[in-house]
Amino acid sequence: ENKQRGIKEIYEPNETNSQTAEIDLYQLMLGRRSVREWKKDKISDSMIELIVKAGLSAPNSCNRQTNKFIILKDEARIRSVASTVKGGRNFFYKAPHLLIVINDIRRYQFPDEIHTPFQDAAAAIQNMLLMIYRMGLGACWGSYTSNTSLILREKKVKKLLNIPSHYFISGIIAFGKPNMRVCFIPRADISDSIYFEKFK
């Protein structure tokens, strides 16, 4: 029946190892940290493709699958993007790779979907950050997004990268082989962060 519907596989959780997988995933989440210093070494295309596949596997609104990914490896192009973005993202200059997530805004037709492309991109970005860390690499999410205060800068980036006007720039990841050690930063306590039934 699934083949007739064009579905090749259905994901079925494996009960025998689900507990171990859950622990491994949780430790992966706890261990991931933002890295802003990298070696100059480039990452292979096969590793980059695996990172993007992790992004493609993320949930997205109405299964639109609008996330597109532009990978920058050329140093001059990376510097051009970094100089355009500016702000507190000077670490972009040091990155051996930039990964830019864009979304086709024509696929979001209703007024209440104005933030939906950013949500779709954020889910993909988190998946990719975890995959990058799992591969022994380091990354930092630059949180660059399309908004009115950055519209002129965004136009420059779009022109530089040949991005059509009907696409949002939804986020940028800088990544590569880490050249720094990142200390553990305590997170907010669960007792101060969770509320049942209503906010207090």
Please describe what each predicted stretch is.
Residues E1-K200:
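Acidic, surface-exposed loops and disordered segments
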